From Swiss-Prot:
<feature type="modified residue" description="Cysteine methyl ester">
    <location>
        <position position="215"/>
    </location>
</feature>
<dbReference type="InterPro" id="IPR005225">
    <property type="entry name" value="Small_GTP-bd"/>
</dbReference>
<keyword id="KW-0653">Protein transport</keyword>
<keyword id="KW-0342">GTP-binding</keyword>
<protein>
    <recommendedName>
        <fullName>Ras-related protein RABA5e</fullName>
    </recommendedName>
</protein>
<keyword id="KW-1003">Cell membrane</keyword>
<dbReference type="GO" id="GO:0003924">
    <property type="term" value="F:GTPase activity"/>
</dbReference>
<dbReference type="InterPro" id="IPR001806">
    <property type="entry name" value="Small_GTPase"/>
</dbReference>
<keyword id="KW-0813">Transport</keyword>
<feature type="lipid moiety-binding region" description="S-geranylgeranyl cysteine">
    <location>
        <position position="214"/>
    </location>
</feature>
<keyword id="KW-0547">Nucleotide-binding</keyword>
<keyword id="KW-0636">Prenylation</keyword>
<dbReference type="InterPro" id="IPR027417">
    <property type="entry name" value="P-loop_NTPase"/>
</dbReference>
<feature type="binding site">
    <location>
        <begin position="67"/>
        <end position="71"/>
    </location>
    <ligand>
        <name>GTP</name>
    </ligand>
</feature>
<dbReference type="Pfam" id="PF00071">
    <property type="entry name" value="Ras"/>
</dbReference>
<feature type="propeptide" description="Removed in mature form">
    <location>
        <begin position="216"/>
        <end position="218"/>
    </location>
</feature>
<dbReference type="InterPro" id="IPR050209">
    <property type="entry name" value="Rab_GTPases_membrane_traffic"/>
</dbReference>
Amino acid sequence: MSSDDEGREEYLFKIVVIGDSAVGKSNLLSRYARNEFSANSKATIGVEFQTQSMEIEGKEVKAQIWDTAGQERFRAVTSAYYRGAVGALVVYDITRRTTFESVGRWLDELKIHSDTTVARMLVGNKCDLENIRAVSVEEGKALAEEEGLFFVETSALDSTNVKTAFEMVILDIYNNVSRKQLNSDTYKDELTVNRVSLVKDDNSASKQSSGFSCCSST
């Protein structure tokens, strides 16, 4: 290892992906981390995670992304996994209005179990199913503005805005951490577990940014 590598700063951020069951959380994560999609994916049992690496301002940033089960009977178990999270994607299915109506409950749970400075992204998934849309883009934007969230619609099926959604959250966390100087050894130790690092395409965020809708009160 070179001296440059040894002296290189490293950040490790925990991000949770939350929302009702079957909104596509697991497929969003697998599309982002492994560029995979499963049309017959089963409901997540418990919690799974992937780690993705990217470079920001010459620093290595690793996002440890946790996929929490949406089924009600698992919520008490997964609540412990909010601990240490500095980012969250709150996902609903644009074809199922009930999942959009549940967003407020998920945001309340996030507020209870995490810090108020968590970077939050509202994600309307399955935008490839425009012909059976039940929640308009305008409704998603309005809720995001009301709650002070970033907002984007995605499709795990065709990859639309998937990288953009995750990387906007990661960048916002990085900016928050840089400002508050939270990159302490204690903070990093809290989030360190066995993981697999995956390297992103450096140009991917810029390529997809044109399709991104951002709504924030800050």
